[in-house]
Each structure stands twice: as C-alpha cells, then as structure tokens.
C-alpha cells in the first residue's frame, strides 16, 4: 500500500549491478521507485550478437527488467536514439575528425542522463532521479548550495565524468552508492537476490561493442579519413599514417614504424593531415588551456586558485594553479610537467574529495 507523501524516484537502470542495487536500496529506504532504461542503440548495432551484454544493449534491458520484476517496481524503456545519435555519436566522430580525443561518457551524462532523462522524470511527476554512479551529493550549509564529492570507494569514483552537473540537477539527484564499495554493492545484490549480482562490468564504449573505435570511425566517416605523414617536431617525414583520427596523444603501439627506438604521438594536425611523433620526453607538458567550463557552485570563476587537476579518467589528480584567462577559458599550470595532455579530454578540478568543476582541454602549453 502506498504511503502518503512517499517521494517518487526514477532510477536509470543499465542492466548492471550498480543501478540494480541503487533501485533496491531506494526501495528499502521507502521511496516509490520506477525503473527506466534508455534505448540509445541504432538498430544495426542491436543485431551484433548475443555475446555483447554491455550497457543499454537489448540484453542489458532484459536484465534490468528481471531486476525490476524481482523488486516489484514499474519498469519502462524510453527511446533516446535520435538525441543520443546527435549529442553523443556525432560528437564522438566529429571530435576525432578535429584531431581530438572525445569522452563520450561525459557527453552522455551532460545531454542525455542528467538533462533529457531528468527532464523526463520531472515531467512524469518524479521528485528525484537516481543513478548507480559512485559519488556523493552533499548539501553545503555554509553556502546554501550542493556539492559533489568522491565516493568512499576511490577505485570506483566517477566524479570525473560528472563535472557538468548543475545546482538544478544536483538537488534532484540521488546517488546512494557513494557510501559503498563495489564489493559491498555486490554483497547487497546477493542479499536482494538480484540476477546482476555477479555480472561483469562493461569496459567498452557502449555504442562501440567490440571497442574498436577505428573500425567505427571508418564505417561512419571513412571517406573523409586519408593517409598522411608521420613527422617529427621539426617537420621531418618519418613514415606514413593511416589517417590522423586513428591516433591519440601519447600512443606508442600500433604506429607501424620501425625507427630503432620508441616513438609516441606528440601532436595531431588535421589541417595538414600530419601526426607528430617524438621521444618519451616530448609528450610531457607544463600545463594546458581549457574551455567549455562548468563549476558546480562558483558564482564566478576566481581569477586564480589552486586545485588538484585530473586530466583523464584513471589519472591521479596533480597540484596545479588555475588562472582565468577569459569568460569561459582557464590556463592550468601544473607543479610538475604532465604526460600526454590530450585535447578533447576533460580536466577536472578537486579540493580534497570535493569536485569543483572542470572543462574541455583545448591545447597543451
């Protein structure tokens, strides 16, 4: 029987153990829970075979539905294909054509999960939306705003891909897994007798099931990708590449060169169709320029502040000085040079466990 005043929450269910336990925990806490999975697949991708069970595949939908049945909650599949194609897949391919390395998870969180899906939840009369991310939303009494903090499981922390959240999003967001470790989550799934309890994690890009992004780019934009030259930092031709979108900063393997010593991708030049390669020392940089910024609770970006800056998902944050150099642009100078700063990736700023905000890396210094 429904309890008067019960808060309603829409749980984004990917078919994995994390979102399954999120739904179970919130139900146990007394929320009225509705489960949804976002249908984001191109029909051509859906028929790739039963071996793929990653996030939001048709097999993941089946797992999410079984969990919802087990918990006794309503469950729906919502069609976000067109929006996902436009905001995530088109962005993904276009960034590579610009000589940059995209982060599709950040784009998905920004435009799909925490924008379109949250708006859908509110339109359906939900009070909150919840996901299985490992992070913690905390109300900061001293400033009257919400902050985002790392999850207690530092190995699983996902705040890096959540820096685009706004105050309006944070006040409607529940992240119950921020207080648990991954092993504790699996133990809870076994306790609740969920079919996803021992399901392995998906490591690939969700819309590139075999994780071969080069093949994906070739199928989508192959007519625009042409061979060109590998050059050193002085412009000397060292060989031929297969197309600059197939490479990323810091890459060593797969260059197809025999030069007697290791070479790494140092820069990508779309305008001349060149991939610059160099020795290990040449992929280190003192800092970067970032734009397209979002800070979770700053009214205005300070002219200058110190923070721990993280330049890729699994990187360790490094001490840096951040200087505002425009309305939507900052310069970040690290205490020590950093390896393989990559345009297109995110730089995210922390103070201790608190996420301050972040932006997109435009170039290295």
Swiss-Prot record:
It catalyses: S-sulfanyl-L-cysteinyl-[protein] + uridine(34) in tRNA + AH2 + ATP = 2-thiouridine(34) in tRNA + L-cysteinyl-[protein] + A + AMP + diphosphate + H(+). GO terms for cellular component: cytoplasm. The record marks 133, 345 as: Interaction with tRNA. Its EC number is 2.8.1.13. Disulfide bonds join 108-206. InterPro entries: MnmA-like, MnmA-like_C, MnmA-like_central, MnmA-like_central_sf, Rossmann-like_a/b/a_fold. It is an enzyme of class 2 (transferase). Signal peptide: none annotated. One of its GO terms (molecular function) is tRNA-uridine 2-sulfurtransferase activity. Pfam families: tRNA_Me_trans (PF03054), tRNA_Me_trans_C (PF20258), tRNA_Me_trans_M (PF20259). The active site is at 108 (nucleophile), 206 (cysteine persulfide intermediate). Residues 156-158, 312-313 are annotated as: Interaction with tRNA. Keywords: ATP-binding, Cytoplasm, Disulfide bond, Nucleotide-binding, RNA-binding, Transferase, tRNA processing, tRNA-binding. It is found in: Cytoplasm. ATP binds at residues 12-19, 38, 132. Its main location: cytoplasm. GO terms for biological process: tRNA wobble position uridine thiolation. Belongs to the MnmA/TRMU family. PANTHER family: MITOCHONDRIAL TRNA-SPECIFIC 2-THIOURIDYLASE 1, TRNA 5-METHYLAMINOMETHYL-2-THIOURIDYLATE -METHYLTRANSFERASE. Catalyzes the 2-thiolation of uridine at the wobble position (U34) of tRNA, leading to the formation of s(2)U34. This is tRNA-specific 2-thiouridylase MnmA. It comes from Carboxydothermus hydrogenoformans (strain ATCC BAA-161 / DSM 6008 / Z-2901). The gene is mnmA.
């Amino acid at each position: 029987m429904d309890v008067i005043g019960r808060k309603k929450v829409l749980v984004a269910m990917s078919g994995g153990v994390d979102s399954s336990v999120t739904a179970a925990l919130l139900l146990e806490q007394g929320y009225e829970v509705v489960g949804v999975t976002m249908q984001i697949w191109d029909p051509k991708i859906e028929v790739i075979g039963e071996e793929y069970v990653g996030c939001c595949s048709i097999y993941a939908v089946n797992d999410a539905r079984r969990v919802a049945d087990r918990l006794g909650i309503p469950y729906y599949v919502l069609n976000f294909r067109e929006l996902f194609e436009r905001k995530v897949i088109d962005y993904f391919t276009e960034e590579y054509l610009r000589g940059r390395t995209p982060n599709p998870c950040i784009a998905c969180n920004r435009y799909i999960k925490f924008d379109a899906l949250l708006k859908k939840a509110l339109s359906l009369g939900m009070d909150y939306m919840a996901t299985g991310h490992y992070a913690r939303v905390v109300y900061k009494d001293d400033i009257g705003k919400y902050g985002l903090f790392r999850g207690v499981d530092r190995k699983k922390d996902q705040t890096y891909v959540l820096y685009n959240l706004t105050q309006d999003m944070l006040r409607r967001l529940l992240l119950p897994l921020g207080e648990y470790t991954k092993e504790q989550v699996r133990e809870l799934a076994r306790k609740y007798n969920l079919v996803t309890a021992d399901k392995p994690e998906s490591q690939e890009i969700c819309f590139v099931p075999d994780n071969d992004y080069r093949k994906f780019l070739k199928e989508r934009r192959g007519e625009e990708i042409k061979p060109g030259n590998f050059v050193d930092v002085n412009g000397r031709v060292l060989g031929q590449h297969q197309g600059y979108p197939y490479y990323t900063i810091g890459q060593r393997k797969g260059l197809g060169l025999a030069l007697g010593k290791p070479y790494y991708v140092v820069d990508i030049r779309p305008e001349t169709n060149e991939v610059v390669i160099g020795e290990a020392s040449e992929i280190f940089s003192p800092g970067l320029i970032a734009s397209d910024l979002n800070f979770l609770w700053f009214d205005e970006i300070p002219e200058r502040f110190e923070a721990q800056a993280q330049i890729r998902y699994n990187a360790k944050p490094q001490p840096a000085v951040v200087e505002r150099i425009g309305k939507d642009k900052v310069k970040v100078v690290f205490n020590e040079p950093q390896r393989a700063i990559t345009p297109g990736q995110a730089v995210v700023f922390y103070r201790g466990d608190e996420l301050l905000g972040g932006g997109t890396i435009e170039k290295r210094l």
